[in-house]
Amino acid sequence: IISVADSKQFVFDPKGISTTQYDNFAQEATPYTLNEFIGLVQQHHLENLLAIDVTASKTFVENYLPLVENGFDLVSANKIANTIDYPFYKKLRETLAQYKKQYLYETNVGAGLPLIDTIKLLHHSGENITRIKGIFSGTLSFLFNTYSASEAPFSEILRKAIESGYTEPDPREDLCGNDVGRKLLILARELDLENEF
């Protein structure tokens, strides 16, 4: 790992980030732009580059195209890139193909289950998928199951879900159905449907 960043600051070390640097991120991080970061990567002739996005940020998704164009493969838990406007979705895939880069996002739907890959493989093998059924929100499942089995107020159960890390960074995304909607759109687009969110 040569860099750790948030939306405004980063730590960069071409020899690898130490645990001390990581632990002291708040003190050691400096402001950066994507162009400065890419410049440092090129200056040090780094290879086998991988950008990992564990945010829920639309702003960071805007970095995907320049990262791919500068030699990065992508791994993302962020659903935004697969659910914003279809022209961006298509452009990202074209850019990945042009630069022969990979984009792994299996955790977008189904947590650790290989649901996206399975749907994609079935579709590409000629299967006509007409329906997908399941529980698409672990958060809502937890909330409803816990609420129906206890006397606790819903707000207390929600607080527990947030503290346990079950919700999206903004729990309103779960509660208003946006998270489920994004997951369903991701699966629809894997079936070559050009739907929008």
Where are the predicted features?
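General beta-strand structural signal in soluble alpha/beta enzymes
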Residues: 3-4, 50-53, 74-77, 103-107, ...
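N-terminal glycine-/serine-/threonine-rich beta1-alpha1-beta2 phosphate-ribose binding loop
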Residues: 1-70
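Residue-level "edge-of-site" marker
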Residues: 4-7, 80, 109, 174
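Rossmann-fold NAD(P)-binding glycine/threonine-rich loop
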Residues: 55-70, 78-107, 111-122
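A general structural motif
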Residues: 47-48, 71, 100, 129
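Glycine-enriched alpha-helix->loop->beta-strand junction motifs that scaffold or abut catalytic
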Residues: 70-74, 138
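A generic secondary-structure micro-motif detector
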Residues: 53-54, 82, 147, 174
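Core active-site phosphate/anionic-ligand binding loop and the adjoining beta-turn-alpha structural block
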Residues: 87, 100-197
